[in-house]
Amino acid sequence: MTAEGLLQILLYLGLLAAVTPLLGRYMARVFEGERTLPGIVLGPLERGLYRIAGIDPAREQHWTGYTLALLSFNLLGLLLLYALLRFQALLPLNPAELGPVGPDLAFNTAVSFTTNTNWQSYGGETTLSYLSQMLGLTVQNFVSAATGIAVAVALIRGFARRAGKTVGNFWADLVRATLYVLLPLAFLGALVLVWQGVPQNFDAYVTATTLEGGNQVLAQGPAASQIAIKQLGSNGGGFFNVNSAHPYENPTALTNLLESFYLLMIAAALIYSFGRMVGDTRQGRALWTAVFILFVAGLAVTWWAEAQGNPAVTALGVETTDGNMEGKEVRYGTALSALWAVATTAASNGSVNAMHDSFMPLGGMVPMLNMMLGEVIYGGVGAGLYGLLVFVILAVFIAGLMVGRTPEYLGKKIEAREIKLAVIAVLVFPLGILGGAALTTVVPQMLASVQDPGPHGLSEILYAYTSATGNNGSAFAGFGANTPWHNTGLGLAMLLGRFAVIVPTLAIAGSLVAKRAAPAGPGTLPTHGTLFITLLIATILIVGGLTFFPALALGPIAEHLSLTAGTLFGAVP
């Protein structure tokens, strides 16, 4: 752990804290229908889109109508992307003449990008045409992120409105999130990436001669435009196989800062937007502080674990003063690799600038735990906020039980219906993660994908189904996921982790929006102070994390203890 690494991390955290209120205020204005500067240019385009689609943005929807519109839109997007992947060999912009994507892989990929997961059981430059990357994946990067923002905004309205019947208009929220938030920021990010050397072309692949005299194929393509939105929209799927560890995706220190900052920017700002939209910025600051504490704690553990190096390597007499550098870019080192790993799993992003499978056991456990907690530590674009508010509901319920009062939040009584729906949303994660991992260990065809023995093999299984259920998309690379069994199983886990959380969340919004707000009384728990922040952190860790402790004890914790004791596990025969 070096002073240079600490300064880099402090710069990142300072930028995040500085931009949060600025972007948060802007997004609150966008979704409250107020005038904004980009609206001068984009307003006519927005109104034109409504006219073409026959949408009246002022006609709001009941939560059931909002949910039906969302599910229909995402189903259509999934089917169109599946068809595009299956028929890409017949379509233009395929200079490498890549064939059609197989049915199980096409299903997995279509589900992955529709659910904002971006799990990739393939290498982008060897599997997908330029058209598939642009028209298929990049489009879904925008609309899946906009879908998450729309759900978060609908839930905010549930808390903010009084005795209402509607939670907004899904189509209007989708368009505004795309036009006013995602598109401008992605455009600016893409310009910076092109400036720094990221490819943005339609050229054929280039064959180059290496210093040893051999040939190497250099992939090309419209990468910058996809990379910008995959970072910004908490998508994460790389244009190239090794994601942002590839020098074409992440060539300089500036691109590394920009891409890692884009990981959390919108998710952090949406928490501030929540405070603005409910009329009490203290509420947003309290939630932001809680997740900031969890984020910094996880980052500290990960960086410490990686900076210590591998004791098995040290025992061989190898110099390890730079820490555990296996699977890492030398230009970024342990500090920036740990920062990215924690940020990408705190958000539901999943992009990487280092290989998580090569992290030390505890260093790899923190990213896994971030996802197991429901990715509410800032979380994905929109998804992080509505997941966090589900835990807020559980926290005030627990507080109400302790003092013997009906729980309430922002004046809205939290009753049996909201608690049941919140519990359903929380139970999705252990069902998908532990259920998928258990199935993998007992089905021989699925277990064959595990390439490492012992505790690390279990960690690879856990990480895969945690990433899929949490809609993250990162992976421990020792897990061979491109099989019909896992393409199907992981695809189902992604669908479960996305829509089995969204539906109860929107139901909570519909229930809350109909309630009147009661004034705070002498027994009301203040939800903007230190006590509530502590209670919320405890709820996230205990309710969200304790379920997974036995699995973590058998995986990364057991691996850490074995490694410390000098016990190693051989390769799978």
Swiss-Prot record:
Keywords: Cell inner membrane, Cell membrane, Ion transport, Membrane, Potassium, Potassium transport, Transmembrane, Transmembrane helix, Transport
Transmembrane stretches, start-end: 3-23, 65-85, 136-156, 179-199, 254-274, 286-306, 383-403, 423-443, 489-509, 531-551
Membrane topology: Multi-pass membrane protein
Main localisation: membrane
Subcellular location: Cell inner membrane
Coiled coil start-end: none
This protein's record includes keyword Membrane: yes
Stored Pfam families: KdpA
CC terms in the record's Gene Ontology section: plasma membrane
Subunit note: The system is composed of three essential subunits: KdpA, KdpB and KdpC.
Cross-referenced HAMAP family: KdpA (MF_00275)
Function: Part of the high-affinity ATP-driven potassium transport (or Kdp) system, which catalyzes the hydrolysis of ATP coupled with the electrogenic transport of potassium into the cytoplasm. This subunit binds the periplasmic potassium ions and delivers the ions to the membrane domain of KdpB through an intramembrane tunnel.
The name this protein goes by in its record: Potassium-transporting ATPase potassium-binding subunit
Organism: Rhodospirillum centenum (strain ATCC 51521 / SW)
Gene encoding the protein: kdpA
